[in-house]
Amino acid sequence: MRKLLNEELGRPTLDEYAESKKLPVVAVLDNVRSAQNIGSFFRTADAFGIEHIALCGISSTPPNREIHKTALGAELSVAWSYYPTTLECIEKLRSEGYQIIAIEQIEGSTMLDKFVADKNQKYALIFGNEVDGVDQAVADIVDGAIEIPQVGIKHSLNVSVSAGVVMWEMFRQLI
């Protein structure tokens, strides 16, 4: 088998991508501290057509060298905004009709393999801090939670890995 060359991949231009239909999904970063993790969010959101990234609290924002290092330019193709707090972001997204879903190990969470996305619903997926996860004040006001099934002793994934798993599943179900 031969690997495809970049020019054979049929990649859209930045303008074509900007005009393309996106999934009705916003990735909300609740105080994600690593700029490299944030860059990975941008790259993954670009790959799966996520409409927006909301950077909250201590989360770094573009332009940032560390974000660019992992985003590889996807910070230019994915729309983003900054909010001083995740609670402010949630309030705005809820007022716009988004269902607020924490990606977290929470009582009553739905395992990702059991989650069924509604194609008529808009989703705001809350991804938490690398150490503390989704803040409890945020968890207290979400509409639901999705948990990624795991079998190892850590029961913990890097936040950008979690984003890849969940964004892929949303893409698979909503495309």
Stretches with model-predicted labels:
Residues M1-I175:
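Post-transcriptional modification and biogenesis factors for structured RNAs
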